[in-house]
Structures are given as C-alpha cells and as structure tokens.
Design a protein with these regions (language model features):
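Active-site environment of divalent metal-dependent phosphoester hydrolases
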Residues: 18-21, 59-62, 88-98, 118-121, ...
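N-terminal active-site segment of His-dependent metallophosphoesterases
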Residues: 3-76, 80
Length: 350
C-alpha cells in the first residue's frame, strides 16, 4: 500500500505524452522536455501525490533513444519528489517493452500496468484516513483478448468484461474488509456519453483529431460511458483534446498539440482532490508549453506583406493556404523568405 503525504490526496491525470513524436518530420524533443520541466514544477507547487499516465507515453512501439531518455529522466525526478506514478500502456505503446522491469519499478513507486491481468490488480493509495484503489486498464485489442474473456471481439464486449471484473474484485476486497473508500479507473479507449444508452452505434460525440490512430473494429471504435458506471473517477486516454465525457469521466488530452487539427486545443491535465467523506473535487490545469502552430490563409501578396502575420515569422510551424487562382511561381521559396518553418502548403479556392 502506498502512503500519501498530505491531508488532501492529490492525483494528477495526464495521458498521451507520445514521447518521440515528430511534427511534420520536425522532432518535438525540445517541447517534450519543456513539458516535463513544467510538469515537475507543477507537481512540486501543488504537492501532487500521484501522477496518472493513461496510455501512449511513447509514440511508437519501438521508442527512440531520445524518448526513452526523456521518460527515464521524468520518472527519476518524480520518484525523487516522492510522487507515485501509475502508467498504463496505450495502442501506440509496446506492452511488452513497457512492462520491462515492472517489479523493480513497483518497489520504487512506479506502477506499470500493461496486461489483461494487471487490470484487476489495483494500486492502493492511502493517507491514513482515506484508502483509494486505482485500477489501470491498458489498451486491450479485442482480437487479442476476447477469447480469454469469453466475449465477442469488440471494444464494448472486452471493456465491459474488464470493468465487470474490476467491480467483482472491488466487492471481494470489501467483503474481506480491505475495500476502498474511492475507486479510480484508468482506460485507454474512445468513450462517448450516449445519455444512458448501452448500445454501441447510438451516437458518438467524441471530438476527434487526425493525430489519433484508428482503433475501430467492424467500423466501431467507441464504447458508451455507461460501462464505467459506479466508479468515482475515470481517467481516460487516447483522445488528444482535454474534455469531460461526464463530470467524473474525463479525457486529460495530450500535453502538446501534434497536428494542425489540434491548433486550437488548450492542452492540460485534470487535478483530482480527495478528502474523507467528501465528493472528489476536479479542476483543470492548462500547460504553458506549446507546439506553436498557425494556419495562415491568403494570397501570396497578403501573406508576404500583412503586418498581422509578423508574430508567426519565427518559432511557429506554419500551414499556408494560398487563395491565388493558380500556384505562384517559386511559392515555397518566396514564403520561406518570411516564415521560418512552413510545414504544409496548399492551394485552395474559396
């Protein structure tokens, strides 16, 4: 059982770090390092007890040397700060690679959850007066896990079986006098509020981004929020926009924007504060670290001469949408004479 050090238990919900990600072939190592530095500053300032990372800590099943170094340094700094870390694997991660050294890390306060069996093995947190069980469900590909669970190979059937197993485990612990005051579930999935419907296909209201990998099975990639009924908080990963599905079922979103479709996202995290006898207090936090990107639209003359675009000349990834009748000769070179980084150029007609 993991001991927390403050009267109010503070848990920070993050996900989808995607270490090793590039932005239109430009490495994001610098921005990821800035995010980790900012995260540590916030952890110290707020007195965070536990950090959740709900899947896709890496961008690839074979992470780069730079990305493994970033994670190693982040976990080391968090351990030194006395912060417990609960990390589940996502659809971008290799669950086998991520589980390496799990027993060693567990003893150091880093709890890796990467397998089906891990989903019903909660991390126990306590501050002496409050006991919290965190069940971390890794990404479970239906075709790989449906047979073991005895269900159809769909996301809804697999996640439904696992959440029912979690409820059964929680009930057994309660019967033994080892039950929790609060139950938190982590999951890496597409979850939509269907206003009580438990039939997949009714309505999917999830905001999407083109930087998220498709996980659909039979054309359906989402599950209803009702699968998570009865839990005190559900920390979701996979969707890159920070938003609540319901009051207690939330996506933290990614810490950085990874495509122009996320240009207007306000990336951040959720802080969950727990006190005995009280409902969880949930607040949002916005990261200052940014992947600076901007879509600029206009004629060649407007783009080269408009003073309004001066802030985007340096330090920004620019998506240029030219509205000229035809593509001007030497368009890229002319635009690069003003804008440092042009990540995408297209000719559009409006």
């Amino acid at each position: 059982m993991t001991q927390c050090h403050t009267e109010t238990m503070k848990i920070l919900h993050t996900s989808d770090w995607h270490l090793g990600r590039t932005f239109h072939r430009s490495p994001l190592t610098r921005e990821h390092q800035q995010f980790i530095d900012e995260l540590l500053e916030y952890v110290h300032a707020e007195g965070i007890d536990t950090l959740l990372i709900s899947g896709d800590v890496y961008d690839s099943t074979i992470p780069t040397a730079e990305s493994t170094t970033l994670l190693d340094q982040a976990l080391t700094r968090l351990m030194r700060a006395g912060v417990q870390v609960i990390l589940s694997s996502g659809n971008h991660d290799s669950f086998r690679r991520l589980s390496y050294g799990a027993a060693f890390f567990e003893a150091s306060g880093v709890h890796l959850r990467t397998s089906l069996e891990d989903a019903t093995r909660p991390v126990e947190l306590t501050d002496g007066t409050l006991r919290v069980h965190v069940y971390a469900i890794p990404y479970l590909a239906p075709r790989l896990h449906a047979t073991a669970l005895g269900v159809d190979p769909t996301h809804q059937a697999v996640l439904g079986a696992v959440t029912n197993a979690i409820r059964a485990d929680a009930a057994e612990r309660h019967a033994r006098g080892e039950g929790a005051d609060r139950i938190i579930v982590m999951s890496h999935a597409t979850v939509s509020d269907t206003t009580g419907s438990d039939t997949a296909g009714s309505a999917d209201t999830t905001p999407r981004s083109d930087s998220e990998r498709d996980i659909s099975v039979g054309g359906i990639d989402w599950v209803p929020a009702s699968l998570f009924d009865g839990f005190d908080y559900v920390a979701l990963g996979h969707i890159h926009k920070r938003y609540p599905v319901t009051h207690t079922i939330r996506y933290s979103g990614s810490p950085l924007g990874f495509s122009f479709s996320e240009e207007h996202n306000r990336n951040g995290a959720y802080l969950i504060e727990l006190n005995p006898g009280e409902e969880p207090t949930i607040s949002s936090h916005e990261w200052a670290t940014r992947v600076h990107m901007k879509t600029l639209r206009g004629t060649m003359d407007q783009l080269l001469n408009s003073p309004e675009n001066s802030p985007y000349e340096q330090g920004y990834y620019c998506r240029i949408e030219l509205t000229d009748e035809t593509l001007p000769v030497g368009a890229v070179d002319r635009l690069r004479s003003r804008y440092e980084t042009i990540s995408h150029l297209s000719l559009i007609h409006i």
